[in-house]
């Protein structure tokens, strides 16, 4: 069975975009692959989070993953910093990574522009740490978005370079796994672009009914169509896309017909959309609260996940040490 590895930075709650864009597919993949899902707390250090936020953020993501249906018996969930072998491989890969190629990585240049007062070595060597996360489990596939494709290419480069330097075929080159039709680009509520944490246009899986309604009722609209079957502008198309995800086909068809016949009342549509989003999120929200209140279970899941991940990583590290020439 092929191995799949995927990580998420603990930078806030999961939103509808995370769910339909990735987590929904993670739940299906756990039945088809040997999956390991981790919470990338080391990666989050590049932005210098407060110490008290690191652990609480990791527990939040863990509870939300469980609430969405990831089964830790099928797919271990672990916190990155609990698997120390990753750091050792990160060191070895950094010895074979060159300054020029790291400085040319697009994500590094973008982050350096966004935080000019905090251009740290962690930002520069982000591709090395991401490669270590993947290669330490000798992953076959890694689910990534387009924004991570260059970092995946770096991971393949580091695997090839290690093999060449030590005259071995030890590391396979991990493939990028794109969900394609299985993934859904969930639009934000601000009229353009996709839903995101930093954009402030997201509906979170843990949002209560009142919060969901408030956000949806504030969504950008226009004055309405001025001709029959008019092409929907992006803000309106975004609302219909959300409705397609959470509402019944009959509900979607009703409002779509209303739009095409120039009879749409956006207020009515938003109220229906808010109710349908809440109906979708409610059972997940309840499970999130249930898992968050069970500290003992979260600790157990994280510990067992770390044990499974460490066993996989230790095997790799012992073999890598031997290849390099170190004693185990």
Name each region found by the language model.
Residues 110-162, 166, 187:
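Internal, conserved structured core segments that host functional sites
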């Amino acid at each position: 069975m092929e191995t799949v590895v995927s990580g998420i930075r603990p930078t806030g709650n999961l939103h509808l975009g995370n769910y339909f864009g990735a987590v929904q597919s993670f739940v299906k993949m756990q039945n088809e692959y040997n999956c390991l899902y981790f919470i990338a707390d080391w990666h989050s250090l590049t932005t210098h989070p407060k110490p008290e936020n690191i652990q609480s953020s990791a527990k939040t993501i863990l509870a939300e993953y469980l609430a969405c249906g990831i089964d830790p018996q099928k797919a271990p969930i672990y916190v990155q910093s609990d698997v120390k072998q990753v750091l050792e491989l990160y060191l070895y890969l950094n010895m074979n990574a060159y300054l020029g190629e790291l400085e040319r990585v697009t994500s590094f240049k973008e982050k350096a522009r966004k935080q000019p007062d905090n251009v740290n070595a962690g930002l520069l060597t982000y591709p090395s740490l991401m490669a270590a996360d993947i290669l330490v489990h000798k992953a076959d596939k890694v689910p990534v978005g387009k924004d991570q494709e260059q970092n995946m290419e770096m991971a393949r480069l580091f695997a090839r370079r290690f093999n060449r330097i030590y005259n071995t075929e030890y590391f396979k080159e991990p493939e990028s796994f794109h969900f394609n039709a299985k993934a859904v680009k969930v639009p934000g509520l601000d009229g353009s672009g996709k839903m995101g944490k930093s954009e402030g246009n997201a509906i979170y899986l843990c949002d209560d009914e009142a919060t969901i309604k408030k956000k949806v009722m504030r969504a950008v609209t226009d004055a309405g169509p001025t001709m029959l079957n008019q092409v929907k502008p992006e803000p309106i198309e975004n609302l219909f896309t959300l409705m397609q995800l959470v509402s019944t086909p009959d509900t979607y068809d009703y409002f779509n017909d209303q739009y095409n016949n120039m009879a749409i009342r956006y207020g009515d549509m938003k109220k229906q959309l808010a109710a349908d989003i809440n109906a979708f999120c409610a059972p997940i929200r309840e499970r999130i609260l249930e898992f968050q209140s069970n500290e003992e279970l979260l600790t157990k899941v994280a510990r067992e996940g770390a044990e499974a991940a460490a066993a996989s990583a230790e095997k790799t590290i012992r073999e890598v040490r031997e290849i390099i020439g170190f004693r185990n």
